[in-house]
């Protein structure tokens, strides 16, 4: 029986790898500290183009690893002229990817004014600027809505976007991801596709999406989309990230 179980486990592992493709990068958040070879911080409280209310910091008060999860913690406190603090981590300058299956297992906060996100920006943002660099929002959730939203942003003689929400109880752990190749970007929730964006042959000026992108994880407070927190919003509140993984899709190449 034990031998059978070992063989079965090996078969399941092989099948999973065949389905996902080759794992090219991951952070399982099993170390005691946040990896400096995987993540850097955006720091400050300039609104980030969205009228956000928080000041992002690199303090352990706002981001840390605990019990195998990355915790991004939004707090209500006076800090550098702002009334809230949180964290925004990114792989910019360390890890960039073109194409692949990119996913994270996460549980995010629900509350008026809360705006957790798992997303990507083009590596060339410093020179091309937004939206010409491209943006892939793998997962966004706002306030008390019972859905997650996947969106792509790019430049086509001005900012354009395409996306779709899908029902989701974000207060529970789910796997959010995209499958991205030269033809399309497919948004996935727990392995099920709910939206697809066509980028084949740079259709509709989507050439941005054939360039390297970096990953971002953040928990914003307030902003033009979710609105401000109110008396019902509970602080501190936490975004939990179990892992982030990047696979090479079968039959396609993922460049770093």
Please tell me what each predicted stretch does.
Residues 19-256:
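GH16 jelly-roll
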Residues 4-13:
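Sec-dependent N-terminal signal peptides
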Residues 14-18:
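Sec/Tat signal peptide C-region and signal peptidase I cleavage site
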